[in-house]
């Protein structure tokens, strides 16, 4: 499960990077693409940090950061929806769906981690 989640987070960050290359080039899409690349890669990188957590509290904190970054990514995707060219619709749909699934997984993980204190 750990490697699968890591792979999904890395894949999401890579697909978002590809998506950002296909945006319309407007000021807002340029601005948001930089932000969404940061938030999606942060989620993947923080997953590695969570795997090396020093305590249950540290793990819970790091997983909470992953969830926050994924939620930020979700909102950025919504804001970018008008800037997506026709050739990027599939990438946008994949990123939206995958991000929603990962938010649900990490939301449950945070709840479980907090209840196991």
Task: Give, region by region, the residue ranges found by the protein language model.
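Short, C-terminally biased terminal segments at protein or domain edges
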Residues: 1-45, 49, 53-117
């Amino acid at each position: 499960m750990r490697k699968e989640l890591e792979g999904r987070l890395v894949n999401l960050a890579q697909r978002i990077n590809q998506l950002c290359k296909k945006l319309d080039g407007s000021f807002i899409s340029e601005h948001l693409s930089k932000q969404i690349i940061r938030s999606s890669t942060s989620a993947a990188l923080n997953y590695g940090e969570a795997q090396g957590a020093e305590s249950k509290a540290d793990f819970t904190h790091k997983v909470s950061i992953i969830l926050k970054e994924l939620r930020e990514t979700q909102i950025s995707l919504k804001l970018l929806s008008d800037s997506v060219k026709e050739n990027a619709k599939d990438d946008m749909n994949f990123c939206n769906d995958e991000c929603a699934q990962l938010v649900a997984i990490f939301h449950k993980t945070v709840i479980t981690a907090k209840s196991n204190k």
